[in-house]
């Protein structure tokens, strides 16, 4: 279906707005993946706070100009599916990585975070905010418990020497 100029401008504006508000972006090629599987992926993306869109490469190049995702221009070859993470930087990467494991024909082309091309594995393994807080609290709790144990041991040793 041919797009007129207004449609193209609307697509560019929509993708540009999504890019400006996104924390990270992931590019993939979904050739050969069934419609049912893609529908499942889109549903999972909505639940994870990920904006997905299939866009023509020329329109996508224009849409990412002036954004942090301009570095991805070289990956805009062939059918391009772009996903922007809105709530967590690793959400789209994690979603695409899991989907690629189950679907051999789904190929992840690249990812960007804070204006730089990143490894998808790196983005997918980023902890969520809640996970990061839990790790920090665990570390703090361990340190406090260890310090208390050493203090009590030193006090016990001091009392034994005095006795």
Swiss-Prot record:
InterPro entries: Ribosomal_uL10, Ribosomal_uL10-like_sf, Ribosomal_uL10_bac, Ribosomal_uL10_bac_type, Ribosomal_uL10_CS_bac. GO terms for biological process: translation. CDD domains: Ribosomal_L10 (cd05797). The keyword Ribosomal protein applies. One of its GO terms (molecular function) is large ribosomal subunit rRNA binding. Disulfide bonds: none annotated. Keywords: Ribonucleoprotein, Ribosomal protein, RNA-binding, rRNA-binding. One of its GO terms (cellular component) is large ribosomal subunit. The keyword Metal-binding does not apply. Pfam families: Ribosomal_L10 (PF00466). Part of the ribosomal stalk of the 50S ribosomal subunit. The N-terminus interacts with L11 and the large rRNA to form the base of the stalk. The C-terminus forms an elongated spine to which L12 dimers bind in a sequential fashion forming a multimeric L10(L12)X complex. Belongs to the universal ribosomal protein uL10 family. Forms part of the ribosomal stalk, playing a central role in the interaction of the ribosome with GTP-bound translation factors. HAMAP family: Ribosomal_uL10 (MF_00362). This is Large ribosomal subunit protein uL10. It comes from Haemophilus influenzae (strain PittGG). The lineage of its organism: Bacteria, Pseudomonadati, Pseudomonadota, Gammaproteobacteria, Pasteurellales. The gene is rplJ.
């Amino acid at each position: 279906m041919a797009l007129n100029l207004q449609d193209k401008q609307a697509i560019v504006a929509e993708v540009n707005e999504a890019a400006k508000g996104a924390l990270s972006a992931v590019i993939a090629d979904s050739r050969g993946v069934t419609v049912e599987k893609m529908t499942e992926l889109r549903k999972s993306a909505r639940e994870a706070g990920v904006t997905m869109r299939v866009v023509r490469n020329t329109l996508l190049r224009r849409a990412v100009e002036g954004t942090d995702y301009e570095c991805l221009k070289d990956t805009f070859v062939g059918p391009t599916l772009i996903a922007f993470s809105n709530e967590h930087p690793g959400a789209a990467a994690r979603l695409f990585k899991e989907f690629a494991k189950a679907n051999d024909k789904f190929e992840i082309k690249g990812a960007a975070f804070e204006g730089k091309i990143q490894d998808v594995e790196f983005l997918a393994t980023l902890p969520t905010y809640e996970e990061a807080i839990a790790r920090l609290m665990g570390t703090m709790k361990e340190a406090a418990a260890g310090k208390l144990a050493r203090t009590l041991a030193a006090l016990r040793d001091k009392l034994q020497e005095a006795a």
